[in-house]
C-alpha cells in the first residue's frame, strides 16, 4: 500500500470569506473516500462567514492556535487552544476569532465533503 500524505504547505490555499483554507485530506489530495480534513487560518476579529451547515455529514473542529467563539444552532461557546467542537449534521454554525492572534483550526468531516456540501445561512450571526 502506498502512503498517502500531504504537507500543509503543499496544499492549495483558498481565500474564503473570513478564512484561508487548505484541504489536507480529500479525494483530490490523498484519494480519501470516507473522510476529509482541512486546516483554516482566521485573522483576529474575523468571522468564518456566512454561517453554514453540512446537510450530508458532521464536522469536528480542533483549535490548534488562538481563541474565539463558536455558534452552533443558536448556542454560543468560547473556544481556546486544545478545544474540539462537534457541529452535528444539518446544524447551523460559525466561528469567530475574538483573540489578538491568528486562529488556526483543523476541520474534520465525515463522510468526506467539499465546499459543495456547505449550505449557506445568510443573515445568521452571533448575538451581541
Language model features by range: what are they?
Residues 1-34, 117-128:
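A short, N-terminal "cap"/entry segment at the start of jelly-roll beta-barrel domains
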Residues 50, 70-71, 87, 93-99:
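Short beta-strand His + acidic residue motifs that chelate non-heme Fe in jelly-roll/DSBH
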Residues 56, 75, 91-92, 101, ...:
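A generic "binding-loop/recognition-motif" signal
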